[in-house]
Amino acid sequence: MVLATIRMMMSAKKFGEALRILRSMAEQSRVQPGCLSSEIYRNGQEDNVLMLEQLWSNEEDLERHLRSDEYRQVLLVLEMAIKQPEIRFDTILSSTGIETIEKARKDNGRRERA
């Protein structure tokens, strides 16, 4: 899996337009092959900061998305940013859920009794 994250700061004047464009693109991305999730987040502590987070099943699907017409919308928003956007692509080799918390808590209980 590949986690693609873009954090960008927009001017107050361009924030609404950027949010509208990214929401539309995220919606289109969700139906593309290999897209596991596509979400837009607003930073609660910093005004005018947006984050696009997408999870792709593999690098090939992500690369196809990066070449798509829909992704041109993201490039447009990146050009609107008032600071250099932070862009990351993280490869995830494995993923777990609640079982990791349960195991850690169970293992901790054993250590406390020893």
Residue ranges and their predicted role:
Residues 24, 30-37, 55-89:
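An amphipathic, aromatic/His-enriched active-site/gating alpha helix that lines ligand/cofactor pockets
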Residues 3-5, 17, 25-28:
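Residues within well-formed alpha-helices
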Residues 40-46, 76-114:
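Glycine-rich beta-strand-turn "strand-cap" elements at beta-sheet edges
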Residues 10-12, 58, 91-94:
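Non-catalytic surface loops within mature trypsin-like serine protease
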Residues 2-8, 39-66:
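Short, well-ordered beta-strand segments in beta-rich or mixed alpha/beta enzyme
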